[in-house]
Amino acid sequence: MELDILFEDEYCICVNKPNDMLVHHAKFSRSIKRELSLLQFIFEKTALKVYPVHRLDRRTSGVVLLAKETSFVSKFQELFTRNAIEKTYFGVVRGFAPAEKIIDSPVKGRDSTVYKEALTEMKTLETVTLNIPVKPYESARYSLVELHPKTGRMHQLRVHMVKISHPLIGDGKYGDKNHDDMFIEKFGWNNLFLHAGKLVFVHPFTSELINLTASFNDNWI
């Protein structure tokens, strides 16, 4: 597997993370030797020790921004805390989603007792009907959607798509098991259909406008 580097300078490196790869292991994780993390993968390919600025869920693919020094991390993180970074995701969801929709609904934070304001803009790009029965219907409908999270809550996009009854395919926690099982059985797809496709921001050190696009992984259908 090759490392897909989207951008690199003296301050950061941006890569296209594959599906089913942790950004980094939890401290004292027992799986460090058994399972390659993104940080380890980058080190193997470049000999760079890098520091994550943000995270993608293990089963989400796409753009990840990493700093080359710990002292650079806070400047890049400010882009996210100030919502000064434009994020675009692509997902496949159950059913025919609305042409456009703004989802304004609180999402639980890392403290599961506290809800935080969350806003997502959604647009449907394509729809398809598969002549494959998925209970309780004789065929199955799906939509390719473009998602713009305007806040950065944990699992925000996954929760918001469930809120409008169009869960992401492959979402074992919030999704529809019948449809997930069909994709495994018919297509061998056992990942989450969520891809961080674009990241746009003004570089905090050079003031350069950075516009990154991560191609879909080969295993996207």
Regions found by a protein language model. Give the residues of each.
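RNA pseudouridine synthases
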Residues: 1-221
